[in-house]
């Protein structure tokens, strides 16, 4: 894998099955070695941020957003133990509500598990695109720290009818810029629902200072070297 990346760095294509290869004479061997070492170190020693959440310890990979900004990737997908634990702890401090709503996609397992543990028969999902089965749609725009361009969220008008006059709890895995929250709030308000509260597993960056957000743990932002931003 490392050798393949080295060849790709110098503009070569690596063909599986080939037993030999050669580098052009104009490529400096010393530079090739340096690049090879850098690739190896990057693959073997990926920066991580170790944290405890809902009584569980997890190592979050630190990922590049811009040249000066890195974030820790919190992925709840596939982690059943973490999903169950986070849902349990959020429900302990949740305000009174009638329904939960979340945005596609990372908030889905959390909302589902919170609904299951609380005995709710239904929760609402704001989709990234309109679906054929929708009777109609409400929409709002969103741009998060991890999305390169503006996205839209869509709510089925059939769900909107059920939300009217009800207390709606907005739930997500991580809140950072708050753009996702604003988009969900717009959908709830448009449907005539009453915002009961806003909850997340983690509050990232400036979101940690929000007084209207209930969360389990703080998630810092990072410098390129993996240190926490001051």
Question: Could you say what each language-model-derived stretch is?
Answer:
Residues 9-15, 21, 40, 45:
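Aromatic (phenylalanine/tyrosine) cluster motif
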Residues 43-97:
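Active-site-facing substrate-recognition patch
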Residues 44-50, 182-230:
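PRPP-dependent phosphoribosyltransferase catalytic core
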Residues 110-118, 185:
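Short Gly/Thr/Asp-enriched flexible loops that form oxyanion-binding sites at enzyme active sites
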Residues 121-167:
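Short, glycine/charge-rich flexible loops or terminal/linker lids adjacent to PRPP-binding catalytic cores
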